[in-house]
Amino acid sequence: MTDWIDGQGRQIDYLRLSVTDRCDFRCVYCMAEDMRFLPRQQVLTLEEIERVARLFVAGGVRKLRLTGGEPLVRPGIVGLCERLAALPGLRELCMTSNGSQLVRYARPLYDAGLSRLNISLDTLDPLRFRAITRNGELDKVLAGIDAAQAAGFRRIKLNAVVMKGRNADEVPALVDFAIARGLDISFIEEMPLGQVGRERGESFCSSDEVRALIAQRHALLDSAEQSGGPARYVRLVEHPQTRIGFISPHSHNFCATCNRLRLTVEGRLLLCLGHEHSLDLRALLRRHPLHDGPLLEAIGEALQRKPARHEFSAAGEVQVLRFMNMSGG
């Protein structure tokens, strides 16, 4: 097989791999405060994750992203990065992190071959940061960003989930922070995954509203740039080195060009973030430890069932009970 093609004719060249459901934060949009995590036997081993990645890269996937939970709380993560970075045909090995562990891990990750880092940063206010993350320390994340730049990472992007009443008023300040640090930043519409104990519809902030906030202070230039993910980009006329992205699952969904799949840490291959359609790869991995044929056949059949689009609603109703940390955030 040379290409993974789904039932809509879309080429799949991007796989997100969740290496853990655990996290040292409890972000309000990601999980419940009293989240219960998976027992070890239900979690894929690093060897199983590597095996899946190897199969997909051999079949045409060119970009892998390691996610969580927080991937840096998984023991052995640096060694996994080193092995994945060496896969023939892989062009990009990326990671999404909350940044709290990067003072320790930035240099080892860079040396292991990680090519890109996305770092979550929803606010620059320490008290708000603790409220959104429920227990996080902003200073650790800011130090982690510094450590990543010092380690040599040149392709660092900040991710901010924008919520009215929590951090929407900080959009301009976050842009200014990205400019000052020479970083890109993407603003994300909150996704209705899991019961998080509050009304999402009341805090929903669309990408168009975020763009309008930025345009009050900066002249924007639309860009046709693509990163292999769902973001639409603009450049700042006076600071063209900073790229601003908008990830808009509600207001400007990107389903028609969807090129990605997600593997959860329990081994479910999610065909769409907004649907429960999935393939139990863990069972196949453990039933066929020496033979890839059954896995390849099952993946090919599953791809034909990948939905044309999600059904997310900006009204805030939960369409998927699975939490974001269980989905590969």
From Swiss-Prot:
Q: Which GO terms describe its molecular function?
A: 4 iron, 4 sulfur cluster binding; cyclic pyranopterin monophosphate synthase activity; GTP 3',8'-cyclase activity; GTP binding; metal ion binding; S-adenosyl-L-methionine binding
- Its domain of life reads Bacteria
Q: In which pathway does it act?
A: Cofactor biosynthesis; molybdopterin biosynthesis
Chain positions recorded as [4Fe-4S] cluster 2 binding sites: 255, 258, 272
Matching InterPro entries, A to Z?
Aldolase_TIM, Elp3/MiaA/NifB-like_rSAM, MoaA, MoaA_NifB_PqqE_Fe-S-bd_CS, MoaA_twitch, MoCo_biosynth_MoaA/MoaC, rSAM
Q: Which HAMAP family does this entry report, sorted A to Z?
A: MoaA_B (MF_01225_B)
Recorded family membership = Belongs to the radical SAM superfamily. MoaA family.
For this entry, the protein name equals GTP 3',8-cyclase 1
Q: Which organism is it from?
A: Pseudomonas aeruginosa (strain ATCC 15692 / DSM 22644 / CIP 104116 / JCM 14847 / LMG 12228 / 1C / PRS 101 / PAO1)
- Its gene? moaA1
